[in-house]
Amino acid sequence: AHMRVEEDSAVGRADAVVYMPDAVFVFELKYDGSAEEAIRQIDEKGYLIPYSADGKRLFKIGVNYDSTQRTISDWIIRED
């Protein structure tokens, strides 16, 4: 398994991609936004497209960091 940060796609850049033998996890991180906004960005910018032909399970993970609380305030994990 390995991880890449700022992984380029055709129309954007995923914050992090984790490659496992049977799955790919695409992370989008927001700062004072929402996890739902992060998931939307993964969908709208097609961050999963480069991995769709590999036959692996695909996961999108949206995470929001709240600067006031100084912690992760929200996250969503969805299998595509």
Regions found by a protein language model. Give the residues of each.
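Short, glycine-/Ser/Thr-/acidic-enriched flexible segments
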Residues: 10, 23-24, 31-32, 67-68
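Conserved catalytic cores of phosphodiester-cleaving nucleases, focusing on short active-site segments
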Residues: 16-31, 45
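Domain-level recognition of nuclease-like catalytic cores that cleave nucleotide substrates
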Residues: 50, 54-80
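Structural beta-strand/beta-sheet cores of well-ordered domains, especially the beta-sheet scaffolds
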Residues: 12-14, 25, 56, 61
